[in-house]
Amino acid sequence: MSSKKELLWQSRFSLPFDRDALLFSSSVHVDKKLYREDIQGSIAHVTMLAEEHIVSAEDATQIIAGLREIEVELTDGTLLPHWEDEDIHTVIENRLKEKVGAVAGKLHSGRSRNDQVATDTRLYMRRQITELQEALGGLLKVLVEKAESHRETIIFGYTHLQRAQPISAGHYYLAWFNMFLRDRQRLIDLMKRVNISPLGAAAFAGSTLPLNAERTAVLLGFDDLFSNSIDAVSDRDIVIEFISDCSMIMMHLSRFAEDLILWSSYEFGYLEISDAFATGSSIMPQKKNADIAELVRGKTGRVYGNLMAMLTIMKGLPLSYNRDMQEDKQPLFDSAETTIGSVAIFTKLLEHTKLKEERLAKLTAEDLSLATEIAEYLVRRQIPFRDAHRITGKIVTWSIASNVTLPNIPVEKFREFCEVIDPDIYDSLKADVSVNSKRTHGSCSFDSVALQIEKARKEL
């Protein structure tokens, strides 16, 4: 069965396009999200056409008025795209023809679907990058506030998911701050490559019409315009780079979510997630599940999948444009929406978490994570570090076997392992002393964390 509507390119063919083929190739259900960007680009294009006397000012005025009406109709739902329209660009052009008649056909002068779509994509990405930067800014602000509130709260630092050394909780939050700050910086850098106008490249070789690509670039707020018309329409590297940036953001969120999930469990008990961001069980009444954190962790896989999809779509495509590129929209849209949504909800979740400070103080006071302090104490007594490490390992083994915590080992026992140990070793076996004894740049001491907070605030 053939399709009923005549498509914009149909005149070349002797047979109507097969209905099932149209259904298979239609993208309007996905790219309808671009209607604002498409209308924005069309208004800029026809404005330039009038200024260059390619169309009359009167025709341009009619077209612009019609486009603005269509934007309202698409926004309020009075105009509903149909799959037989092939894509959102066709929806808009057909509706414009209904409104202003044959003059609508002048809109596409000097423009191909190729540079039209490339322009829409860049306009969409520009908006989404800005929104994602703002969402990250909110998360960074909460992290600084958490760091400031818990600058002197002692928690465990981990390696290999094993308690390693006591640290300031503020130091922990600032570690995440720096990761998400780099994520935002990557987006800022990406914007330099996204905010370049491809409009005027036409299909890929340019146009014989006296188009003013510089003018449309200015009208659309682009910082620059394309250098090569083939490149302008035939690559989607910026989409791949954006989804890669989203993947890194989601990776950081997923790792952070994992900590929150573990720390809020009964086995750890370091942190309380607000009831407003937890769910229960349909059968087990006692359960309090960190579902929001788990969903953020789970959605990371979707964004990773989108990145692999885009790399695979573009692999092996000959220059210049190929219809395969139509498949870039779903990974792009889903990655943007998933990442922005995940950052926003995770920020609220984190803001309402509470560290169980009393429990943490008790646990960190007498834990084996103070062992490194013994080794460094011995180094300060001129014991070579490798020997100090070996001696401390034996002390830890005895401590575990004897069920005696490090701060409670008698000095006489310490001296059985190394005779240079004096009673002043107990000064090092306190969690707060351990934290504040750190002297190196960017370390976890309270003073160092205060400096890091001051620096972080300048980035907000």
Swiss-Prot record:
Give the top-rank taxon of the lineage listed in the UniProt record for this protein. Bacteria
Instruction: Give any Gene Ontology cellular component.
Output: cytosol
Q: In which pathway does it act?
A: Amino-acid biosynthesis; L-arginine biosynthesis; L-arginine from L-ornithine and carbamoyl phosphate: step 3/3
Enzyme class comes to lyase
Q: Which Gene3D superfamilies match?
A: Fumarase/aspartase (C-terminal domain), Fumarase/aspartase (Central domain), Fumarase/aspartase (N-terminal domain)
Q: Where in the cell is it found?
A: Cytoplasm
Keywords of the record, alphabetical order, are: Amino-acid biosynthesis, Arginine biosynthesis, Cytoplasm, Lyase
GO MF terms here are: argininosuccinate lyase activity
Question: Which catalytic reaction applies to this protein?
Answer: 2-(N(omega)-L-arginino)succinate = fumarate + L-arginine
EC number(s): the record gives: 4.3.2.1
GO BP annotations, alphabetical order: arginine biosynthetic process via ornithine; L-arginine biosynthetic process
* Family annotation (SUPFAM superfamilies): L-aspartase-like (SSF48557)
Which InterPro entries does the entry link to? Arg_succ_lyase_C, Argininosuccinate_lyase, Fumarase/histidase_N, Fumarate_lyase_CS, Fumarate_lyase_fam, Fumarate_lyase_N, L-Aspartase-like
Q: Would you identify the family this protein belongs to, as annotated?
A: Belongs to the lyase 1 family. Argininosuccinate lyase subfamily.
NCBIfam families in the cross-refs:
argH
**Designated name of the protein:** Argininosuccinate lyase
Q: Which organism is it from?
A: Pelodictyon phaeoclathratiforme (strain DSM 5477 / BU-1)
